[in-house]
């Protein structure tokens, strides 16, 4: 099996890259691709850059050039569920955009025109991730909705609106739904696994700066464990 892994930032891909065997590097379209072996699997690790457009470009290039059997998005997120803490892991059951609004034309909040309202993650990949986290016994985990938008969610009014629009949302980040949309269009199974670097409404900028490496490490540890089971 060939697995594509996408992280937006250096802190989100560093551990994975350090454990790859003999990786080759390709820079294309502002993205970095590292092809090699990790945990016995052929892996293409991608550093996409931050945000929906960067993630879409990286995912499209990854799928077109390397044709992985599945895609896993790893990295950090901001926690919205009340009982999440720094370092906890959320596995996405589905991804939605929180900053898309074409409801004037009859679409759901967060639904892009001519696209589904949500991009479900692959059930087999979800189950493998759950098993791996349970075996590790290191992190609290939840499975549910993660939302994506091109903003760092630290302003009280933005947080309140997101909670009102998506009351079931567990976490928020800036790439996953874009990756999900591209995978949906290419008909490739995908999963998003995110560890919490900050919690909504709790000194988020300072928390993100302090804990991005912790979150990146926790998420990457899950991915490495998963590769051994795929």
Swiss-Prot record:
It is an enzyme of class 3 (hydrolase). Keywords: Amino-acid biosynthesis, Hydrolase, Methionine biosynthesis. It comes from Aeromonas hydrophila subsp. hydrophila (strain ATCC 7966 / DSM 30187 / BCRC 13018 / CCUG 14551 / JCM 1027 / KCTC 2358 / NCIMB 9240 / NCTC 8049). The active site is at 12 (proton acceptor), 198 (proton donor). This is 5'-methylthioadenosine/S-adenosylhomocysteine nucleosidase. Coiled coil: none annotated. InterPro entries: MTA_SAH_Nsdase (IPR010049), Nucleoside_phosphorylase_d (IPR000845), Nucleoside_phosphorylase_sf (IPR035994). One of its GO terms (biological process) is nucleoside catabolic process. Pathway: Amino-acid biosynthesis; L-methionine biosynthesis via salvage pathway; S-methyl-5-thio-alpha-D-ribose 1-phosphate from S-methyl-5'-thioadenosine (hydrolase route): step 1/2. NCBIfam families: MTA_SAH-Nsdase, PRK05584.1. Substrate binds at residues 78, 153, 174-175. PANTHER family: 5'-METHYLTHIOADENOSINE/S-ADENOSYLHOMOCYSTEINE NUCLEOSIDASE, 5'-METHYLTHIOADENOSINE_S-ADENOSYLHOMOCYSTEINE NUCLEOSIDASE. It comes from the Bacteria.
């Amino acid at each position: 099996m060939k697995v594509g892994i996408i992280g937006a930032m250096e802190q989100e891909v560093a551990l994975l890259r350090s454990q790859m065997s003999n990786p080759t590097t390709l820079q294309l379209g502002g993205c970095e691709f590292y092809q090699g072996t990790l945990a016995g699997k052929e892996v293409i690790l991608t550093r996409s850059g931050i945000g929906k457009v960067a993630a879409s470009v990286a995912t499209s290039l990854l799928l077109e050039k390397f044709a992985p059997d599945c895609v896993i998005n790893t990295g950090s997120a901001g926690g919205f569920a009340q009982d999440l803490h720094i370092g906890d892991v959320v596995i996405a059951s589905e991804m939605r955009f929180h900053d898309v609004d074409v409801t004037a034309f009859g679409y759901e909040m967060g639904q892009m025109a001519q696209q589904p309202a949500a991009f479900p993650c692959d059930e087999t990949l979800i189950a493998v991730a759950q098993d791996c986290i349970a075996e590790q016994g290191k992190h609290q985990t939840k499975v549910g909705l993660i939302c994506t938008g091109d903003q760092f969610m630290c302003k009280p009014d933005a947080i309140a609106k997101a909670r009102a629009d998506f009351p079931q949302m567990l976490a928020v980040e800036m790439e996953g739904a874009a990756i999900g949309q591209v995978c949906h269009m290419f008909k490739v199974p995908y999963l998003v696994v995110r560890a919490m670097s900050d919690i909504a409404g709790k000194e988020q900028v300072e928390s993100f700066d302090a804990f991005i490496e912790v979150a990146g490490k926790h998420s990457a540890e899950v991915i490495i464990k998963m590769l051994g089971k795929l």
